[in-house]
Amino acid sequence: MEGKNEDMHTPRGPEDASNIADEYPSPERQQQGDMLGHDIHHHLDMHHERDARDTHSPGQTDMQTELAKQVAAQAIEAAVAHVQANADRQEAGGTEACGQVSNGNQRDIHMREEPHLSNSQHHPRQPVFPRSRQSFIALSPTSVATSIAGPSTLRRSPLPDTFSRSPAPLSANDQIAILRESYARNPNPDRKELERLAARTGRPWNKIREYFRQRRNKLRGLEQLEKMEEPGRASGWLQITYRSAPVTSQVPQLALYNSYRHRFDPYSSSTPLLGGQDLIQLACATFPGCEMARDDGEYVLKGLKEKDKEREDALGDNEAMGRKGREIDPEEWERGMEGLVEPLRAGSWLLSSFQSQPGTSGSDITQTDLYTSYAARFSSLLTGVSGTSNGNAHLNGHHGLSDEEAELRNHAESLKAFEDAGLGDTQGEEDQPPTVEESDQNETSPASFPADPNPLPQAPRESRLLTPVELINLTRMTFPACEPCVDSSGRFVIKGLERREGLEPGRKSREGEMFPFALMSEKQPGEEFVKVMKRKLASLHPDAIERRNAGESKRKRDDALTEEDKELIEGLKRFRGSKLGEQVRDVCVSQ
């Protein structure tokens, strides 16, 4: 009996193991349905309870391997679900390709594990055997997550906004700085260097080659000027660097002189530099229309402009950034001002032609001169109005030549009355606007034009001039510091207003238009420079040191002066402290 009991309780094969499982159902077999929804950590906790039974089942290796596969499939499903949930929360805006890769991996895992799941479902009496510790280590959460999420992470395509963007194009000043730096290193670059600069600046290589060629020619011309004498050298430098321009363009006098002084050697004894006053006068004589002026407290040269060949050659004609960085052409400004309507046109003209100088003691502008200049500047734009009204009168047949002559006569009389009495006579001011307004009404009246089969919609354009009162009021609004008044001579003037041009028509040039170059304080040499020069002079004359040590210089100083020399020295001392001496010193400094 004992032998039978031992045979009964000692499992010897798969059949005995299945019988034992029927008599003593395993707790793992009852909880197998509940464990399908748990993760891998729950299996790790149950591993310690099954570890003790692992030593009593040495003959059940095949069943254990198959069960390990089933548990591995469950662990993989749980890991995939966990990783997919985290990926959905962290990367809600991920790309479609990433989702396809992860879904494909999950689909492959399900397809690989379906046979094991189906086999386990067809054997309900199959017992659950514990698996080895190595299987749990191989299927740890970190390893499973890495094996599942790793390939999808590597195959994930970058987001659209993370692609490498092309660098922003360089500005005009940056391109010129790069070209100048390259020219300083190598004035004659080869084809490879030109292509490298083209890739760096974004300009064609042939344009860069032309820039280098013109810069070599320009500097070659400046090198030839080094050997010339003044004033020919300064005149040639002015013609190379500057050009004539409209009066609206200007160059500061101090900037012009500093450019000239920095270009040539100021310490050359053979070809000394011109003074500031001589250079400014030479510039006015070299360029017709160039004149000295004072604009908003700054001494400038009107009608002069610096050449911009380097900028134009480096950037080309179709470069948008180059157009933004270039200076506005004064001629284009004048044409654009003519296209404006009143009072914008008159306001722009006032700002470009006059300036406010309340502290000056010069002659004020009369109101008659102001309106005469305004009418002379824009009266040519009214020629089309008179011609149109003439044609309209001829088409209508209601207005004869007598009416036109009367209108012109009234207009001339109003201007004459205004010029004679300034703003005191208001009769001309009242007569002038109706004349111009009547011409506008005749021009824009629909009955005066013949019927056009294809009329084009066009807005009527105002082409009249401002009245004297309107122009004076606009001047007061444009320059608040100015004030219309009557001077001591009984003239109607605008106090505190002066022209921007250097020379007023019919008058002498104003004082103080040239920069006071004589008052420019030169920098005093430093102590180190003085010490170096003393040592240099001492090395050139070593005998002077010996004589100084011997006391010869003292004996020469102690020589008695004659009475005439003493009287001369005393007279010079008195003259230096007198008012006449101060005046002479000021004149010498100013010259």
From Swiss-Prot:
Disruption phenotype: Shows normal growth at 30 degrees Celsius but exhibits growth defects at 25 degrees Celsius or at high temperature. Reduces resistance to osmotic/salt, oxidizing/reducing, genotoxic, endoplasmic reticulum (ER) and cell wall/membrane stresses. Reduces LAC1 induction mediated by nutrient starvation and leads to greatly reduced melanin production. Markedly increases the basal expression levels of ERG2 and ERG11 under sterol-replete conditions and decreases the induction of ERG2, ERG3, ERG5, ERG11 and ERG25 under sterol depletion. Significantly reduced the virulence. Residues 1-37, 148-168, 420-463, 543-563 are annotated as: Disordered. The keyword Lipid metabolism applies. Residues 427-441 have a biased composition (Acidic residues). Its main location: nucleus. Disulfide bonds: none annotated. SUPFAM superfamilies: Homeodomain-like. Induction: Expression is induced by nutrient starvation. It comes from the Eukaryota. It holds the Pfam family Homeodomain. InterPro entries: HD (IPR001356), Homeodomain-like_sf (IPR009057). The keyword Cell inner membrane does not apply. It is found in: Nucleus. One of its GO terms (cellular component) is nucleus. GO terms for molecular function: DNA binding; DNA-binding transcription factor activity, RNA polymerase II-specific. Residues 1-15, 543-560 have a biased composition (Basic and acidic residues). Signal peptide: none annotated. CDD domains: homeodomain. One of its GO terms (biological process) is melanin biosynthetic process. General stress-responsive transcription factor that governs multiple stress responses and adaptations. Plays a key role in virulence. Mediates the expression of LAC1, which is the major laccase involved in melanin synthesis. Positively regulates BZP4 induction under conditions of nutrient starvation and basal expression levels of MBS1 and USV101, 3 major transcription factors that independently contribute to melanin production. Also acts as a key regulator of ergosterol gene expression. PANTHER family: HOMEOBOX DOMAIN-CONTAINING PROTEIN, ZINC-FINGERS AND HOMEOBOXES RELATED. This is Homeobox domain-containing transcription factor HOB1. The lineage of its organism: Eukaryota, Fungi, Dikarya, Basidiomycota, Agaricomycotina.
